[in-house]
């Protein structure tokens, strides 16, 4: 089969997307504007607002409103293409129920937890908010304050939040919603390579001979990257595509090899491949001997449940989940030898010939393999292990850090990499892979921030799941949520999420652009600017940092998260939040506000507004009197320059279509850790995994372990949750786009037809999905894109009217603390 690239682009990017979504694209797909009236539009560049692919778009503005967008032909990521969500970017900011003023729960003229929402001014909102935060800080200390942020924060918004929480309020109770999606990937990188984020880039796609998808439906979740994979598959017929999943989905349509496996058995399959490589003598011994070491990880590590849970009580190594010990290659070979073809086929349910064919793709030294994975790996009670184990395979064969040979973790949010991971908005991190538990790292941050020694606390803060538990238990009492919808996204939300938000002891603030399940659970709602209503920067999955200008004003009184964070800092005198002994080390800070110390510190405020581009507005710069974004970025960039995370100067990014770090002497890095590509690799070494002190990557011996909950007689089905092409995350933006809403208006329960028949239900019939934790009502779907095997159901989570996370289990990976949304036990009950 052959297809011209032009035809491929037309059919894949437009027709296929439209067919899947059921959306007429007439008027939205035309990239060349010829109408005279339309030609008066002002066009500017920006990265897409949705997933972590980082597509470039051109944005048209007229009369202070975004009126059109199209794929940016000059963007290397997408080369002019858009997915169906990208086609409708111009509509995401203009839902009729946009939040435009602060709303506070009021009763009898004053704030009350049981009050009704009423409009207030920003001053009133911040007065009440500051009063509540100061009360908690005084009564309980900084550990009773928390913030839940986002992989959708811009780089400088995340950096400002990091400074406010970890240096200002002196608490590490800051975590992003990327904990739900990328924590296992980040910890996997750190354990194997000593440094976070992929070594490869999207150029691997055009150089690979085989693609293996592990728990990733790229056709719907990363459709533009999927068009590039499809292009490679069709233009190079020898290229193979293998897809592994617990149920059949759209990505199966391109696959040469499909493997539908029993949930959790991917662990065994990964070990089988390693065993096959060793047994057939295809180990790249020269690479392995020079560039790797072997360790055996602790097993029986529990499931991240509450400490009193029986499974946690029974786990032998729950207190040292990330521990490991050194072993030899021979020890590793013996360890994986158990995972032979017979055992793995029986455990996984995958036919032997398919397992062998998959293993051969990795084992064949002539085949360049790129592995892609997303939530199927990461949202897993052994997600860190999955990440480590796929690296094992690439390291054993030396298929890493060269064009086409790449283990590639894909991200789901536009700046889960650039903000959550690189900036370090996790409860244990600081910028550029630094961590709060390392005293040298803390001192380095304090020096850059011009703070006294001991400002940053050494104790790891509460991660996302623990934050909900602490809110419920009354241990966190002042809490700020920004750019996420956790009361729709959190597992076991009715038992472990909502009770904490409505706990009478707690004051909950939610900043968002639209009403959501989470805003309705709050005490104070702050209206947020979104996307091109502010100047921003995102970092995508291939380490590409991209900037955009503010193109339009936010409606009403909506303000950016950056403005909210920085303005709120003015409400606190240093004496109100720091102990006397700390302040004594910097007596010149006495009487100053956190704003003075953190943001008007002589570094962040060093760039005057005369450096602004006169073509564009910048509300934050006008509000504070200096180029705030540039000051924050340049201070943040100090952490990474010279340390393998080099960023280019601020002004460069507004001209470029993004650059992949490390950027050294103006040159971006495509493949890390390889001599000749990565400037940090010493000449003569070939490869150098310099994140680890010895320059070597770690190959981990890790076992198969069962999930915490599996189907039984009472709850006979596996439940998996996830996304669909038309909607993004909780749907708070995409469900307000009429075309996307109509294409997929509500969630359904995808089920095998034979299971439906056995239950006496038909397509479209209402059922309840019931677990040990809760239940929700939806309709049965036995046809369409997702085709579960018997015994498994799939329910998307985008629908605020059908909260599937009432049902899910709040078990996490005990190392990364990322939730497993992909497997728990349920029963289906006809209504």
Curated annotation (Swiss-Prot):
SMART domains: Molybdop_Fe4S4. It catalyses: 2 Fe(II)-[cytochrome] + nitrate + 2 H(+) = 2 Fe(III)-[cytochrome] + nitrite + H2O. Residues 41-97 form the 4Fe-4S Mo/W bis-MGD-type domain. Mo-bis(molybdopterin guanine dinucleotide) binds at residues 85, 152, 177, 181, 214-221, 245-249, 264-266, 375, 379, 485, 511-512, 534, 561, 721-730, 805, 822. The keyword Oxidoreductase applies. It is found in: Periplasm. Keywords: 4Fe-4S, Electron transport, Iron, Iron-sulfur, Metal-binding, Molybdenum, Nitrate assimilation, Oxidoreductase, Periplasm, Signal, Transport. It is an enzyme of class 1 (oxidoreductase). Residues 1-38 form the signal peptide. Catalytic subunit of the periplasmic nitrate reductase complex NapAB. Receives electrons from NapB and catalyzes the reduction of nitrate to nitrite. Belongs to the prokaryotic molybdopterin-containing oxidoreductase family. NasA/NapA/NarB subfamily. Binds 1 [4Fe-4S] cluster. Component of the periplasmic nitrate reductase NapAB complex composed of NapA and NapB. Its EC number is 1.9.6.1. Its main location: periplasm. It comes from the Bacteria. This is Periplasmic nitrate reductase. [4Fe-4S] cluster binds at residues 48, 51, 55, 83. It comes from Bordetella parapertussis (strain 12822 / ATCC BAA-587 / NCTC 13253). SUPFAM superfamilies: ADC-like, Formate dehydrogenase/DMSO reductase, domains 1-3. Its cofactor is [4Fe-4S] cluster; Mo-bis(molybdopterin guanine dinucleotide). One of its GO terms (cellular component) is nitrate reductase complex. Substrate binds at residue 797.
């Amino acid at each position: 089969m052959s297809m011209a690239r032009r035809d491929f682009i037309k059919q894949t990017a437009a027709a296929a997307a439209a067919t899947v979504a059921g959306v007429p694209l007439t008027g939205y797909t035309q990239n060349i504007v010829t109408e005279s009236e339309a030609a008066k539009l002002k066009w500017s560049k920006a990265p897409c607002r949705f997933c972590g692919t980082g597509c470039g778009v051109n944005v048209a503005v007229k009369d202070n409103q975004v009126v059109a967008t199209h794929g940016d032909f000059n963007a290397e990521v997408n080369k002019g293409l858009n997915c169906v969500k990208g086609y409708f970017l111009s509509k995401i900011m203009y839902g009729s129920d946009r939040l435009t003023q602060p709303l506070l729960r009021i009763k009898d003229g004053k704030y009350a937890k049981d009050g009704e929402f009423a409009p207030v001014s920003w001053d009133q909102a911040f007065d009440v908010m500051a009063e509540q935060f100061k009360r908690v800080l005084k009564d309980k200390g900084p550990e009773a304050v928390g913030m839940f942020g986002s992989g959708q924060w811009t780089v400088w918004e995340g950096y400002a939040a990091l400074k406010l929480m970890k240096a200002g309020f002196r608490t590490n109770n800051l975590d992003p919603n990327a904990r739900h999606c990328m924590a296992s990937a980040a910890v996997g990188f750190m354990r194997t390579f000593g440094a976070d984020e992929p070594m490869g880039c999207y150029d691997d796609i055009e150089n690979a001979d085989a693609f293996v998808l592990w728990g990733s439906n790229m056709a719907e979740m990363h459709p533009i990257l999927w068009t590039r994979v499809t292009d490679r598959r069709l233009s190079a017929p020898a290229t193979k595509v293998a897809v592994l999943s617990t149920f059949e989905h759209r990505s199966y349509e391109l696959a040469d090899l499909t493997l539908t496996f029993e949930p959790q058995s991917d662990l065994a399959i990964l070990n089988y491949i390693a065993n096959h490589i060793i047994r057939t003598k295809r180990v790249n011994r020269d690479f392995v001997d020079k560039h790797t070491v072997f360790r055996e990880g602790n097993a029986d590590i529990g499931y991240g449940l509450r400490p009193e849970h029986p499974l946690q009580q029974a786990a032998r190594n729950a207190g040292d989940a990330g521990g490991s010990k050194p072993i030899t290659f021979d020890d590793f070979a013996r360890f994986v030898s158990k995972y032979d073809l017979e055992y793995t086929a029986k455990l996984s349910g995958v036919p032997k010939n398919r397992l062998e064919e998959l293993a051969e793709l990795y084992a064949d030294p002539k085949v360049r393999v790129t592995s892609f994975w997303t939530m199927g790996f990461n949202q897993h009670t052994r997600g860190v292990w999955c990440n480590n184990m796929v690296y094992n395979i690439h390291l054993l064969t030396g298929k890493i850090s060269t064009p086409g040979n790449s283990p590639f973790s894909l991200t789901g949010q536009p700046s889960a990499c650039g903000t959550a991971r690189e900036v370090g908005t996790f409860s244990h991190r600081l910028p550029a892979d630094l961590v709060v538990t390392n005293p040298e790292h803390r001192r380095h941050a304090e020096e850059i921030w011009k703070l006294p020694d001991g400002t940053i606390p050494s104790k790891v803060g509460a991660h996302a799941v623990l934050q909900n538990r602490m809110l419920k238990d009354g241990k966190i009492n002042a809490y700020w949520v920004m750019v996420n919808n956790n009361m729709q996204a959190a597992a076991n939300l009715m038992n472990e999420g909502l009770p904490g938000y409505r706990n009478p002891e707690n004051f909950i603030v939610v900043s968002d652009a639209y009403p959501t399940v989470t805003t309705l659970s709050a005490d104070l709602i702050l209206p947020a600017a979104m996307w091109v209503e502010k100047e921003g920067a995102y970092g995508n999955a291939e380490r590409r940092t991209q900037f955009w200008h503010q193109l339009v004003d936010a409606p009403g009184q909506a303000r950016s998260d950056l403005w909210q964070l920085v303005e709120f800092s003015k409400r606190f005198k240093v004496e109100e939040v720091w102990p006397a002994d700390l302040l004594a080390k910097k007596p010149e800070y006495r009487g100053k506000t956190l704003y003075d110390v953190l943001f008007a510190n002589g570094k962040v405020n060093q760039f005057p507004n005369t450096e602004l581009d006169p073509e564009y507005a910048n509300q934050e710069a006008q509000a504070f009197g200096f180029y705030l974004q540039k000051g924050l970025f340049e201070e943040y960039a100090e952490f990474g320059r010279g340390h393998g995370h080099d960023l280019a100067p601020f002004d460069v990014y507004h001209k470029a279509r993004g650059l992949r770090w490390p950027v050294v002497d103006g040159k971006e890095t495509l493949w890390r850790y390889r001599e000749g590509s990565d400037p940090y690799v010493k000449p003569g070494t070939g490869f150098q995994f310099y994140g680890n002190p010895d320059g070597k990557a770690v190959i981990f011996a890790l076992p198969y372990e069962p999930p915490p909950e599996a189907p039984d007689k009472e709850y006979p089905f596996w439940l998996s949750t996830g996304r669909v092409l038309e909607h993004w995350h909780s749907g708070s933006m995409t469900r307000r786009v009429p075309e996307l809403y109509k294409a997929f208006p509500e969630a359904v329960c995808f089920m095998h037809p034979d299971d439906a028949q056995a239950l006496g239900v038909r397509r479209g019939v209402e059922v309840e999905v019931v677990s040990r934790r809760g239940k929700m009502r939806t309709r049965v779907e036995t046809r369409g894109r997702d085709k579960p095997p018997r015994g498994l159901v799939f329910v998307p989570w985008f629908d605020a009217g059908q909260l599937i996370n009432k049902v899910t289990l709040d078990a996490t990976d005990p190392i990364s603390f990322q939730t497993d949304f992909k497997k728990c036990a349920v029963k289906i009950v006809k209504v």
